[in-house]
Amino acid sequence: MADFWLSNKQALDIPLIGRQAFKVFFCFAFAYFISYSFRSVNAVLSPELVNDLEISSGELGLLSSSYLIGFGLAQIPVGILLDKYGPRITEISLMIFAVVGALLFYSADNFALLFAGRMLIGVGVSSCLMSALSGFRSWYPIDKQPQLTSAMLIFGTSGALFASAPVRIILPYIGWRGVFLSLAMICAASIVILYFFLPVKTPKEKPTIWISNSNKVKLLSWESYRPILTNPNYLRLLPVGAISLGGFIALQTLWLGPWLINVMHYTSEKSSQLIFWFNAVLLITYLINTFFLPRLQLIGVSTFSFLSWMTGISLVAQGAAFFLHGPLNIFWWGLYAITSASFVLAQSLVITSFPISHSGRVSTTYNVSIFIGASLMQWGIGYFIDKGIEWGLAVPEAFTLSMGLYLIIQALGFTWLILAPKFLPQFYDSENVKSKL
């Protein structure tokens, strides 16, 4: 059994095609489905959690952020583990923490245990997408990377759909504790699937990181991460991950529900239905992108150009959603879902800027920025809602104030995305950089 765990008896034909390619993709996709379910479920459970725990908006944001904190803290170790041991051992080992965290959350009777349980869940699912991206970079053609990334998000968004209306339907029967017990059981099933069906990384020479003078350095050192953190493409795409995608995660997984209830005055049931349709639009957009992106490339439209346009349009959609509270408000949220589906493409652009041997560290380093941003946005939105109320604003106006501040931050990040070569031309004058973006 140990030999099966650590060695690779069956050689893979690279790149993967056909049945083997689909099988490997499904293993990653099912795990990511569970990850997204854990991430999104608080948007539906928040009224029950608030009632049971009597917590404020800021405290609710902190509880939800505990998932993101655990997720973010695990990213650097995940990158090292992925490059050293491969996706299979890394993802299985970590998902055990998710099962333990879900069981702790299920049985918790105080805020501290809830916080600890949700943080463990964040640690446990922290490699679900990154393991997939690392595996894709190693086992699939490079021109398929954006398409595979979008396909993964189809399954992730399916998890968000599962965590919205379906959870609302079963909630009266099993309660929020039963929801987490069920997720723990599904997560355990995913571990079994990963164990038996994912390829095993062949043991190789102890991995080292490339730097310009070709010296070998320790994996966990500044010299190991300097080429990543100072890479022009990484820096240019950083705001898309930390601000745009991070903020989207904060809205999708927590604040969209309270917005619909407190600003648009929908019931909890109606809010859950609208969150379901928001995620359905997102899923359909990911599906369209999976087939649409390769065709755009054929006519000369780069992934970076597509990402830039969608990021800009998303600002318009959010501005309308935040400030126009009429009957068309849900339309603007739908447009935001459509445009935000492109944010994840920044990850594939960053990863393909580096050699395959670095894919684990590159993907997780960028993911750290995403989840630091998501944690700050999730907490910050709640903080300024509470502050707005303290300053004498009504609850709907406090929500609008907080969302408006978030929109301004996004606009600054978008400005950097577009004008970075003008701000720092010395970073963007090489053909290597131009060819990537």
Region locations from a protein language model:
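Juxtamembrane intracellular "pre-TM" segments in multi-pass secondary transporters
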Residues: 8-17, 202-238, 436-437
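Extracytoplasmic
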Residues: 23-57, 252-257, 377-378
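Extracytoplasmic gate region of multi-pass secondary transporters
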Residues: 42-43, 232-289, 374-382
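Conserved MFS/SLC helix-loop-helix module at the cytosolic interface between two early adjacent transmembrane helices
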Residues: 73-112
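Helix-to-loop junctions at the C-terminal end of transmembrane segments
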Residues: 76-86, 286-301
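Paired small-residue
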Residues: 97, 101, 112-120, 328-335
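Cytoplasmic helix-loop-helix junction between adjacent transmembrane helices
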Residues: 117-155
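Helix-loop-helix hairpin linking two adjacent transmembrane segments in secondary transporters
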Residues: 151-203
